Amino acid sequence: MEIIPAIDLKQSKAVRLTKGDMQTAKIYSDKPWELAKEFEDLGAKWLHIVDLDGAFAGDAINLKTIEKIVSTTNLQVEVGGGIRTKERIKSYLNSGVSRIILGSIALKNPEFVKEVAKNYRVVVGIDAIDGFVAIEGWANVSKMQASNLAKLYADAGVEAIIATDISRDGMLNGVNVEFSASIAKASGIDTIASGGVKDINDIKCLKLNGNIAGVIVGKAYYEGKLDLKEAFKSNF
């Protein structure tokens, strides 16, 4: 199971939010490329980046910072946040990003996502509140059940689904294993759990579930609750 550290970017700084609320942004580094190098030195192979400004603006607001992160490390990088066009996908991939996370557009335009998944490395981000998909920086909650959206992508050729329980995000109160497992079951493809990881025991619980391919960790590391070096050595 892949452990994937996360960097959320707001005005080129590494921040963490609570339940996706931009007003709760806490800055952890004004040099996120150094933070990325730190993750690499601890043993990470992947890095999860969200352009928070981009998620609301629908543009690559933090592209230059992401380019610097990519050039500073040998990490495989996945990026999400306001990516809605082929041109934007190409610009990220041309910058050295490994794969693209498509969130809001995965609900609004599934055919577009299925089309680009034929030619590019795509991950679908499904963010949910009480089981229903939230989009546009989590500002709007739809009537689509997360598990039903996951089913749409069962045979679409996407690499994975990132399943985020927004109610747990940044709360350090434990990952929602059942939610992630339900997405994995509905889609039949690799599912990465996100939101609420508080310590290494959460990672162990996900591993025991058996069908979770990865986990994204953020605030637990930043707040000193999770020893990433130990986690990587544990060979989950």
From Swiss-Prot:
Q: What CDD domains does its record include?
A: HisA (cd04732)
Q: Where in the cell is it found?
A: Cytoplasm
Task: Write out the pathway annotation from the protein's UniProt entry.
Answer: Amino-acid biosynthesis; L-histidine biosynthesis; L-histidine from 5-phospho-alpha-D-ribose 1-diphosphate: step 4/9
Q: Which UniProt keywords apply?
A: Amino-acid biosynthesis, Cytoplasm, Histidine biosynthesis, Isomerase
Cite the EC number: 5.3.1.16
The superkingdom listed in its UniProt entry is Bacteria
**Where does it mainly reside?**
cytoplasm
Keyword Transport in the entry? The reply is: no
Which family would the database say this protein is a member of?
Answer: Belongs to the HisA/HisF family.
Kindly provide the name given to this protein in its UniProt entry. Answer: 1-(5-phosphoribosyl)-5-[(5-phosphoribosylamino)methylideneamino] imidazole-4-carboxamide isomerase
Q: Please name the source species.
A: Campylobacter fetus subsp. fetus (strain 82-40)
